[in-house]
Amino acid sequence: MACLGFLLPVGFLLLISTVAGGKYGVAHVVSENWSKDYCILFSSDYITLPRDLHHAPLLPLYDGTKAPWCPGEDSPHQAQLRSPSQRPLRQTTAMVMRGNCSFHTKGWLAQGQGAHGLLIVSRVSDQQCSDTTLAPQDPRQPLADLTIPVAMLHYADMLDILSHTRGEAVVRVAMYAPPEPIIDYNMLVIFILAVGTVAAGGYWAGLTEANRLQRRRARRGGGSGGHHQLQEAAAAEGAQKEDNEDIPVDFTPAMTGVVVTLSCSLMLLLYFFYDHFVYVTIGIFGLGAGIGLYSCLSPLVCRLSLRQYQRPPHSLWASLPLPLLLLASLCATVIIFWVAYRNEDRWAWLLQDTLGISYCLFVLHRVRLPTLKNCSSFLLALLAFDVFFVFVTPFFTKTGESIMAQVALGPAESSSHERLPMVLKVPRLRVSALTLCSQPFSILGFGDIVVPGFLVAYCCRFDVQVCSRQIYFVACTVAYAVGLLVTFMAMVLMQMGQPALLYLVSSTLLTSLAVAACRQELSLFWTGQGRAKMCGLGCAPSAGSRQKQEGAADAHTASTLERGTSRGAGDLDSNPGEDTTEIVTISENEATNPEDRSDSSEGWSDAHLDPNELPFIPPGASEELMPLMPMAMLIPLMPLMPPPSELGHVHAQAQAHETGLPWAGLHKRKGLKVRKSMSTQAPL
């Protein structure tokens, strides 16, 4: 908590702080009835642009894109250099095409013609232009003689500008570099969405585990009443059906290897064949998001008291209610709508984030890692995958950029102009050059949510099994939030994309292990054998009340049995001079272990009872929920004792019957007092 209290103020300071622009700027183009802003790229080491539009000069735009602008080439502007009295570029901003000479050479030619600014149009991407500087071809040539701003403009933006310059309209342009924030407010939105998704998915997984254990306990505890058997059978069948529908998929170590292999393969295929395989990811996202949206909304729809539509009994959809059919149709319509308008930057990101969150919740709910060993191996394998594709791959790419960043943002030379949908994306909320340039959105991959979310879900399931009041779940969720804050800080300090799993997996895994070690449950937490301490359903809100009712019923039954036993024992103990008795208290271990034959049953070994006179108890019935017969009712069934010559035969026969009687373990109750005979009974 102390670390969290330190990181939150620091993160807030980073939110409100700004830094001077680096290489991105804005070209504000204005005509008589039209204006628009365009992204420009410049070198902040050699050029200083005004910080706001009010201080930027608004100059006429000169179109020089049809003539070469390099020394030695046949250019009419070079001839004009010989006549200083004629300067057609005087007090204008020239726009020329990128040639074979350096930016400095072009800027020097434009400055010689009287231009006050130069826009160089280029077809290459930002990554390829990042190596282009204003350094002259001759290193010994100084840059002091270049005083005008020189910036690069995209070719598509040049075409858009020229489309508005038809006729005699005068077009003016102003270049400036607004301050860029270190971190935008949209990162706070992404933080809330990510932490909320992880917490909701983990809690949903724990709630499902609690309901599953509750149904299992209900199926194991059955009564002997004949009129309840049909109802119990129907309830067991319905619970079994719900259990089969809600049962999660256990993740094995073999699946970990398959997932890592497929992830590496898909990453490389997207890097080399992005325009083809991006549609594969769009299809996978559409299918998974549709199923996830249906899975999240179906519990709410099922709670509505809507009448089922009467369909033919032999129909394929006869068992599916009408509300669920309508919900499935709605989910399919939403997916089709998103596919059609997925590239609308103004509002489509809201729909994509909604579908993405439902997809993540569905995965966290349906996929279960049964042990911490499997969970740790899965998280560490994907951690190595993330670190490799972010920190190692830049040494092998031509542009020096990581494969992960190029695939996540999409190659600039992509002809499809598609973006991967497997991310949470929020547009920048502060106006800056980055809003117009290649980074209008801040993104967070689904892997940075789902992979640590598996551990959060495991912690909540473990809380259910050991009744720890969600200690593991809360600690792991807070650790995820702290790890995400550290990820944002590392991204700001290093000015590059970060392998978020490096911080998220470390924080969540170490925190969970520390909590288990402090509670001395490390072995149980590692193996996932929390059911050994199951005493209730900690994550299910409705389970506590049901547990209290069951405990009250057991206490009432035990007290009734104890009173009946006391009365029966009093009848047997009519002659205190001949018999010496002692009170035996059955321990909890003896009561719950059917194989441990307690010595307290010796007092009942002389009873010769007919098994046909006892109620029939099903073999599968739970001993805890078995209807108990007071011991006072058993006393009249005992026959008179035979002469001493027949006592041995009767005693042996009673012991033979004792092993097969279903009531042999009825007295083995926690805290149940039974009288133990210390002498043989005298003959009558």
Swiss-Prot record:
What post-translational changes are documented for it?
Glycosylated.
- What is its subcellular localisation? Endoplasmic reticulum membrane
GO (cellular component) term, any one: endoplasmic reticulum membrane
Q: What is its main location?
A: endoplasmic reticulum
Taken from the record, one Pfam family name reads: Peptidase_A22B
Membrane topology, as annotated: Multi-pass membrane protein
Can you tell me which residues form the catalytic site? D386, D448
- Gene Ontology molecular-function annotations: aspartic endopeptidase activity, intramembrane cleaving; molecular adaptor activity; protein homodimerization activity
The EC number(s) this enzyme carries: 3.4.23.-
Name the UniProt key words of this record, in alphabetical order.
Endoplasmic reticulum, Glycoprotein, Hydrolase, Membrane, Protease, Signal, Transmembrane, Transmembrane helix
Biological processes per GO annotation: acrosome assembly; fusion of sperm to egg plasma membrane involved in single fertilization; intracellular calcium ion homeostasis; membrane protein proteolysis; protein stabilization; sperm-egg recognition
Ranges of the Cytoplasmic topological domain: 208-253, 298-319, 366-376, 461-472, 517-684
Looking at the UniProt entry, the stretches that span the membrane are: 187-207, 254-274, 277-297, 320-340, 347-365, 377-397, 440-460, 473-493, 496-516
Q: What class of enzyme is it?
A: hydrolase
Q: Where is the composition biased (Polar residues)?
A: 582-592
SMART domains cross-referenced by the UniProt entry: PSN (SM00730)
Specify where the region named Disordered lies, as residue ranges: 216-242, 548-614
* Annotated ranges, domain PA: 83-163
| Assembly, per entry | Interacts (via active sites) with FREY; the interaction stabilizes FREY1 protein and inhibits SPPL2C proteolytic activity.
Q: PANTHER family under this entry? A: SIGNAL PEPTIDE PEPTIDASE, SIGNAL PEPTIDE PEPTIDASE-LIKE 2C
Task: Sum up the protein's function in the record's words.
Answer: Sperm-specific intramembrane-cleaving aspartic protease (I-CLiP) that cleaves distinct tail-anchored proteins and SNARE proteins. In elongated spermatids, modulates intracellular Ca(2+) homeostasis by controlling PLN abundance through proteolytic cleavage. During spermatogenesis, processes SNARE proteins and impacts vesicular trafficking which supports compartmental reorganization in maturating spermatids and may play a role in formation of the acrosome.
Record-given protein name: Signal peptide peptidase-like 2C
Organism per entry: Homo sapiens (Human)
The primary gene name is: SPPL2C
